[in-house]
Regions:
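C-terminal regulatory or interaction extensions
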Residues: 1-167
Length: 167
């Protein structure tokens, strides 16, 4: 089964159209599902800026990416595992702005999942895909809970975004 991720890099904080069009990169990554995660991971990591900072105390210079890998990779894996594949012609979209990275997955919440209970309710729309991704060690079935515990401020933004999806 193939899946597509469309990566769009926007110059600015909002996408513009017409004479102010500000998309500086637009790339589609089309791969079988098990290769898609690796391909997207490599491509997106290459798009991130890397900052060099001098550590306080040791004086050593260390590099850190614009966005830590864990949250955005979890978002991509989750989107691949749980997107609505019945929505033909749709794709996962990763939009990179100057101040944020957004991951959109086609389809509405499945079955009993809502914006309010998503952090503790488990339901897999694509049981076979989720099982195979677990066997290949891409999924541990606790991604969103781990994300919320690790990134509480970003989780608040995520909840607000998820609530918009249900309207």
């Amino acid at each position: 089964m193939h899946c597509r991720i469309r990566f769009i890099r926007i110059d600015g904080r909002e996408m513009q159209v017409g004479a102010n069009y500000n998309v500086v990169k637009d790339k589609s990554i089309d791969e079988p599902i098990l290769r898609l995660v690796d391909a997207a991971k490599a491509f997106i990591a290459d798009q991130l800026r890397v900052f060099t900072k001098q550590e306080h105390g040791s004086g050593k210079f260390v590099e850190s990416p614009e966005y830590p890998e864990f949250p955005w990779l979890e978002g991509i894996i989750n989107a691949v595992a749980h997107r609505d594949y019945a929505a033909s012609g749709q794709f996962i979209k990763v939009s990179m702005y100057d101040d944020r990275l957004e991951i959109e997955s086609p389809g509405r919440f499945p079955n009993i999942v809502t914006a309010d209970n998503i952090s503790y309710t488990r339901f897999s729309r694509n049981k076979t895909i989720a099982r195979v991704m677990t066997e290949f060690e891409w999924v541990r079935e606790l991604a969103l809970k781990r994300f919320i515990q690790t990134w509480p401020m970003r989780a608040c933004l995520l909840r607000n975004t998820l609530k918009r999806q249900t309207r």
